[in-house]
C-alpha cells in the first residue's frame, strides 16, 4: 500500500468516521479547498455539516485506487438523519448511499484537493423528498 493510499484510508477512518479533527490538520494542506474557504478548517466544515445531520454516519470503503499523486476512494455510507440536511428537516430515517471521493496529494503527502461524487438523489429519496419533473413551457 502506498503512503498516499494509507493517508486516504486514514482520512476516511479518522476524519469522516471517528470525527478526529486533529487528523485533518495533519493530512490536509492549507490551500485545499473546502466549504467556504481553504485548508483543514474548511474541509472540516463540510464534515461537521454531515455529522450534524447524520450523527451516526459511517463510511465503508469499497475500493481504493492510487496512482501518482491521486487516490480514488469508492465508498458506501449509512446513517440516521437526526438534524437538518440542507432544506430537509430531520426525518429520523436511516439512509444509505454511495459515492466516490478523489484526493490529490502534494509531494509532502498532504491532501491539496478533494472532489466528491455522491448519489444525492438516492439519499434524498430515502429521506422522503419528492422528486418532481422539471417544469415545461413558459
What are these regions (language model features)?
Residues 1-138:
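C-terminal and inter-domain tail/linker signature
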